[in-house]
């Protein structure tokens, strides 16, 4: 509806990509939701720009999520599309899986390695990190995750050390907050 209202149904020329921090559908195991609630409404947009989602608790290990998205396969070998990174111009986009069963040292060690490589990469000036569960939320305190706090701490330390800003995107609360 936003594109129809703001841009007469057209995709703006300066829209380079779409990032979605999880909860793409209500029930990830239901095919009709992917078609009717996700792909059909966004068909015009998704046909013109790349889409980089991370998995939320509503998609949790849905075979449809992994079937419909071809995400970078540069995460840990056993979970390569659960966490990943993609370079887009001078931005490194990092996708993390903050669902409970993937809150582990393997993912945090992988992030350490990616941030070390990013520090050395002179072509990368910014990091956009997206994950589903927020560390802090003014909208839903029960949805906060300490694990995400560990990720945010690593990203903030990276930015302080390198001067390369990291911007963090979260889902789960289904709302906007700046807190």
Protein language model annotation of sequence segments:
Residues 22-23, 56-57, 132, 171-172:
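Active-site glycine-centered loops adjacent to acidic/histidine catalytic or metal-binding residues
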Residues 20-25, 118-140:
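Short acidic, glycine-rich surface-loop motifs adjacent to enzyme active sites
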Residues 1, 17, 90-100, 128-132:
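Active-site-proximal beta-strand elements of phosphoester/diester hydrolases
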Residues 18-20, 53, 129, 169:
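Residue-level marker for buried hydrophobic side chains located in beta-strands
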């Amino acid at each position: 509806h936003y594109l129809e209202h703001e841009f007469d149904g057209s995709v703006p020329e300066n829209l380079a990509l779409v990032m979605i921090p999880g909860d793409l559908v209500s029930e990830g195991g239901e095919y009709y939701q992917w078609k009717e609630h996700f792909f059909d409404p966004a068909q015009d947009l998704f046909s013109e720009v790349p889409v980089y989602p991370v998995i939320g608790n509503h998609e949790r290990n849905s075979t449809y999520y992994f079937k419909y998205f071809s995400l970078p396969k540069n995460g840990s070998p056993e979970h390569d599309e659960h966490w990943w990174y993609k370079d887009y111009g001078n931005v490194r986009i990092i996708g993390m899986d903050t669902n409970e069963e993937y809150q582990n040292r393997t993912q945090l060690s992988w992030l350490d390695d990616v941030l070390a490589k990013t520090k050395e990469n002179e072509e990368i000036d910014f990091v956009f990190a997206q994950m589903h569960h927020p560390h802090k939320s003014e909208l839903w305190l029960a949805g906060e995750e300490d694990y995400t706090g560990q990720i945010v701490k690593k990203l903030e330390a990276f930015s302080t050390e390198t001067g390369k800003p990291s911007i963090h995107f979260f889902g789960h609360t289904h709302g906007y907050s700046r807190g």
